[in-house]
């Protein structure tokens, strides 16, 4: 499934894109696309719906982030070999984790706010894994069972803040709107992540 949140900022409704590309309203079946909606049992119910019977949404509404009410926005630094080389850094032996503020989450085509004194605004296209089942101390073999789906994320950074004003990743990456995602989440069952070449 391709799940979306559509409508004016702060008034988004849940929806899905059917196989023909038609936007369909899910409001009668789920209040919003949050952690509860992305839990395995809820996703199974949504997958069982006949998309053709859902109300069609006319026009081309704005798409918001395909998930709301997140508890954490976790990212991994230097996660691509080419990016590590580009920055002149070695491949880290352990992943570099950092958090982006939840307020950095925004829709895929929403304006990105440039902070005052910004000098080196940068962006990186990433693939985001949306966790649908609470996960803690999960084995590598079981990890993908906690993923609800995937979407595109634009990891926006202010490199001047990040590298020249204290070396803090949070300072350079957590400004409001610095995490546009979407336009939709594709559920895990429809993505062969091992073939994604990322």
How would you label these PLM feature ranges?
Residues 1-95:
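N-terminal non-catalytic cap/leader segment that marks the start of a structured domain
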Residues 70-197:
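Glycine-enriched loop-and-adjacent helix/strand subsegments that border the catalytic/binding cleft
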């Amino acid at each position: 499934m391709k799940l979306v949140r559509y409508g004016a900022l702060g008034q988004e409704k849940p929806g899905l894109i059917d196989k023909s590309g038609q936007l369909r309203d899910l409001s009668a079946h789920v209040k919003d696309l949050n952690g509860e909606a992305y839990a395995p049992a809820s996703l199974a119910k949504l997958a069982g719906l006949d998309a053709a019977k859902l109300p069609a949404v006319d026009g081309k509404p704005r798409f918001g982030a395909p998930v709301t009410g997140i508890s954490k926005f976790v990212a991994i630094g230097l996660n691509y070999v080419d990016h590590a080389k580009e920055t002149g850094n070695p491949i880290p032996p352990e992943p570099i984790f950092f958090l982006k503020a939840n307020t950095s989450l925004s829709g895929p085509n929403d304006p990105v706010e440039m902070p005052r004194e910004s000098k080196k605004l940068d962006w990186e296209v990433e693939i985001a894994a949306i966790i649908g089942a609470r996960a803690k101390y999960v084995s590598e073999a079981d990890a993908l069972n906690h993923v609800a789906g995937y979407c595109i994320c634009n990891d926006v950074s202010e490199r001047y803040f990040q590298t020249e004003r204290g070396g803090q990743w949070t300072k350079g990456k957590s400004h409001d709107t610095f995490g546009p995602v979407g336009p939709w989440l594709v559920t895990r069952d429809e993505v062969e992540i091992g073939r994604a070449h990322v």
